């Protein structure tokens, strides 16, 4: 954001120089990245008028001009092709200096004396690329101005321009008024808005506005100005636009851009005579609808986009760019000024989808204040009346379906001081907040604060503390020791150590760690088959999202793992094994009244020739074993994201530690993954809660173990864990451990059945077991499997 210091000083009385202002604003949170000075190095350059122009006698590409500078007439030789007799131009006299230390002297060019130099815009320090075609690569053509007037005075050129880095949460600072408000608060000066007075004629405003998409258009204001005369805008306005990096076009368009820079509200001007029945309709685009935008390109739209239309056609892409079919041209007589407020995330989505960004979309997508729309419209009407010769028709159309309510917060000054480590008086806090246009009322030991409409980023007590801190000055807050706070020196907490141990186990199992963003969209949940009434749908919404696909804080890691799996598969990676340790955000209630629960979660994902259900189960078992969590139970999972017969929940002490299994084929189809993918999500917080990593000495067994194999035929849908559970329960006191070594379906196995084979180790810690004792226990296990699970010994 480029802000002219002379423009800034119209709204705040401040005498400090640019450097002091830049330092103060940077310290209060409005970071200044650079300062560019205009006119400082320019001297002895005046306004002149060409009174005659002849070909150079000795050069085909040079001209000899006589230029009147008021006090005298000078002969100047030039090679410019864009000049003519009668043109007003900047003239650098003998002894003049220009930006970059260039000095001008009398000289002879091919035998003809030149007593000065005609100047281009670039030679005056302006960006020539922003000028109209006829002004580029030639002399800067001026409007009629007093001859001999100093060019700095004529163009209001002498100025400093501050370049600000504006963060996305402060769209109110994308304006001169916004920066002026911050300047006034920072330097304890008075702030004033521009004076706006509109003189209306008796003729009523004929425009009508219908908002058909109130979820995307929060407010739409329209004014009509008739009998405008299209021409160049005042030179001072053009120069201000150039300093701000905006191309001057004509007086009407320049006024809309000027007001956008001044107040932060994008405007658009339609040729009213091209709007069918003077009826503006704000609606969603139709799928396949076409619109040629002002850049001359045809855009194919869809129903996710918002358009401004009349009764026949789309005439503008809401918040992004107007349509060519209602463009302001030299023949335009009557105009309609649009000042509207649109949903920021929708504007960002449209802009990104069409690959079309503009100064307007850059502001709208951050979320603007709907309360500024009328003021901006009136300001534009005022300037058009003055500089376009227009007549403002009576009445303003203002469609505002659901007026915005101001946020009201209750804060306690003592908590603010505790939070900041300061000892500020309540009166000082109130003074700071009021300088930022917060309304503050003392109520006992509390402050009731009404947040200004333009400060959507202030939603809680911590935000108020930040406002006070930055205006008080972070550099003024004295260092202090923390009181009553637990600290750890030189080591990780138990939770951090266990998280690191989990990471080491997963890396040792051959998985690669990934890191993904914490934001998701509704589409991510749709793609993994999350039901509409699922708790996972109750996600925290981002106030100023980067787009619809990043509008929520994520409640699951699965979509991100599948995205990474797809990226690897699409790049011909044949074997994929990965994990992520991150947080999911689960709100306790919506709308949000307190911070959501942040659950640390492990996400697993893998595919490949050697990968199956038991591969991912083995990784999980290894992790739990290292964490000292034994005797977990695996039960069938009924999760819509997973294959119903090839997924499981992990239970320990009646709590769910996680879910894993083969990803549902429908979900894989949504991600264009033609291979089987196995995934899982584990609650790391619960794993850490139950972890028991204290090492205990266990003597080596004195007596030998006896190993026996058992293979049984069971229903194909029966979980192997259920077979293992029966074996261990029946053989308690004798069965030391079990290991699955085969699952078989095929010839010699009945339809709907499968063969499951285990190795069983029998051991007593009191004596050596005899064959008879082992046979007896083994037989009991076979019988229990038959009775409880319907198993048949192979």
UniProtKB/Swiss-Prot annotation:
> Which BP terms does GO give this entry?
phenylalanyl-tRNA aminoacylation
- Subcellular localization, as worded in the UniProt entry: Cytoplasm
GO cellular component terms attached to this protein's record: phenylalanine-tRNA ligase complex
**Reactions the enzyme catalyzes:** tRNA(Phe) + L-phenylalanine + ATP = L-phenylalanyl-tRNA(Phe) + AMP + diphosphate + H(+)
Query: Where Mg(2+) is bound, by residue?
Result: 457, 463, 466-467
List residues of the tRNA-binding domain.
Answer: 39-152
Q: List GO molecular-function terms, semicolon-separated.
A: ATP binding; catalytic activity, acting on a protein; magnesium ion binding; phenylalanine-tRNA ligase activity; transferase activity; tRNA binding
The residues covered by the FDX-ACB domain are 701-794
Q: Tell me the protein family, please.
A: Belongs to the phenylalanyl-tRNA synthetase beta subunit family. Type 1 subfamily.
**How the protein assembles, per its UniProt entry?**
Tetramer of two alpha and two beta subunits.
Q: What is this protein called?
A: Phenylalanine--tRNA ligase beta subunit
Species per Swiss-Prot/TrEMBL record: Caldanaerobacter subterraneus subsp. tengcongensis (strain DSM 15242 / JCM 11007 / NBRC 100824 / MB4) (Thermoanaerobacter tengcongensis)
């Amino acid at each position: 954001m480029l802000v002219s210091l002379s423009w800034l000083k119209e709204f705040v009385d401040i005498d400090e120089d640019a450097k002091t202002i830049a330092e103060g604003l940077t310290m209060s949170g409005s970071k200044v990245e650079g300062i560019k000075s205009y006119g400082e190095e320019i001297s002895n350059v005046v306004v002149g008028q060409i009174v005659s122009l002849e070909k150079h006698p000795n050069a085909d590409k040079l001209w000899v001009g006589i230029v009147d500078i008021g006090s005298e007439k000078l002969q100047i030789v030039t090679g410019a092709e864009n000049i003519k007799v009668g043109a007003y131009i900047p003239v650098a006299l003998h002894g003049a200096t220009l930006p970059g230390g260039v000095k001008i002297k009398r000289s002879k060019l091919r035998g003809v004396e030149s007593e000065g130099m005609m100047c281009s815009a670039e030679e005056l320090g302006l960006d020539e690329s922003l000028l109209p075609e006829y002004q580029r690569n030639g002399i800067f053509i001026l409007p009629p101005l007093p001859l001999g007037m100093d060019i700095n005075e004529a163009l209001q050129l002498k100025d400093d321009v501050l370049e600000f880095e504006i963060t996305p949460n402060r769209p109110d600072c994308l304006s001169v008024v916004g920066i002026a408000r911050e300047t006034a608060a920072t330097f304890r000066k008075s702030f004033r808005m521009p004076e706006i007075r509109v003189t209306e004629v008796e003729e009523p405003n004929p425009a009508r506005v219908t908002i058909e998409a109130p979820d995307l258009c929060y407010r739409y204001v329209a004014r009509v100005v008739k009998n405008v005369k299209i021409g160049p805008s005042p030179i001072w306005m053009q120069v201000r636009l150039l300093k701000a990096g905006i191309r001057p076009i004509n007086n009407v368009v320049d006024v809309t851009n000027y007001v956008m820079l001044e107040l932060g509200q994008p405007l658009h001007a339609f040729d009213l005579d091209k709007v069918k029945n003077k009826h503006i309709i704000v609606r969603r685009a139709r799928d396949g609808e076409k619109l040629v935008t002002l850049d001359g390109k045809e855009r194919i739209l869809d129903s996710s986009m918002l358009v401004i239309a009349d009764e026949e056609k789309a005439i503008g892409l809401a918040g992004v760019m107007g349509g060519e079919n209602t463009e302001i041209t030299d023949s335009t007589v009557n105009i309609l000024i649009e000042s509207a407020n649109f949903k920021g995330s929708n504007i960002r989505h449209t802009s990104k989808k069409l690959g079309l960004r503009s100064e307007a979309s850059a502001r709208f997508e951050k979320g603007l204040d709907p309360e500024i729309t009328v003021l901006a419209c009136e300001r534009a009407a005022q300037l058009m009346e003055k500089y376009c010769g227009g007549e403002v028709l009576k009445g303003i159309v203002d469609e505002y379906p659901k007026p915005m309510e101001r946020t009201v917060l209750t804060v306690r000054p003592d908590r603010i001081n505790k939070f900041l480590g300061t000892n500020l008086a309540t009166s000082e806090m109130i003074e700071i907040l009021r300088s930022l246009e917060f309304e503050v009322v003392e109520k006992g030991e509390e402050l009731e604060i009404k947040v200004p409409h333009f400060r959507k980023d202030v939603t809680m007590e911590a935000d108020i503390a930040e406002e006070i801190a930055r205006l008080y000055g972070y550099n003024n807050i004295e260092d202090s020791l923390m009181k009553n706070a637990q600290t750890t020196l030189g080591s990780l907490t138990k939770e951090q150590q266990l998280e690191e141990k989990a990471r080491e186990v997963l890396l040792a199992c051959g998985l690669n760690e990934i890191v993904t963003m914490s934001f998701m969209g509704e589409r991510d949940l749709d793609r993994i088959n999350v039901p509409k009434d699922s708790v996972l749908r109750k996600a925290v919404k981002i106030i100023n999202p980067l787009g619809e696909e990043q509008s929520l804080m994520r409640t699951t890691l699965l979509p991100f793992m599948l995205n990474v799996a797809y990226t690897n598969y699409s790049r011909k990676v044949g074997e994929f094994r990965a994990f992520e340790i991150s947080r999911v955000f689960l709100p306790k209630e919506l709308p949000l009244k307190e911070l959501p629960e942040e659950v640390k979660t492990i996400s697993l994902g893998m595919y490949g020739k050697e990968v199956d259900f038991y591969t991912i189960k083995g990784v999980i078992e290894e992790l739990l074993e290292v964490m000292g969590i034994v005797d977990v139970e695996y039960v069938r999972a009924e999760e819509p994201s997973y294959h119903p017969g090839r997924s499981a929940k992990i239970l320990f002490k009646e709590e769910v530690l996680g879910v894993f299994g083969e990803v549902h084929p429908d979900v894989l189809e949504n991600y264009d993954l033609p291979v089987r993918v196995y995934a899982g999500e584990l609650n790391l917080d619960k794993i850490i809660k139950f972890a028991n990593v204290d090492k205990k000495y266990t003597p080596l067994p004195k007596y030998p173990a006896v190993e026996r194999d058992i293979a049984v035929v069971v229903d194909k849908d029966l979980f192997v864990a259920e077979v293992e559970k029966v074996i261990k329960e029946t053989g308690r006191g004798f069965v030391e451990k079990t290991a699955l070594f085969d699952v078989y379906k095929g010839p010699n196995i009945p339809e709907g059945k499968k063969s499951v084979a285990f190795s069983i180790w029998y051991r007593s810690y009191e004596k050596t077991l005899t064959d008879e004792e082992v046979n007896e226990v083994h037989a009991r296990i076979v019988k229990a499997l038959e009775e409880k699970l319907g198993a048949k010994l192979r």
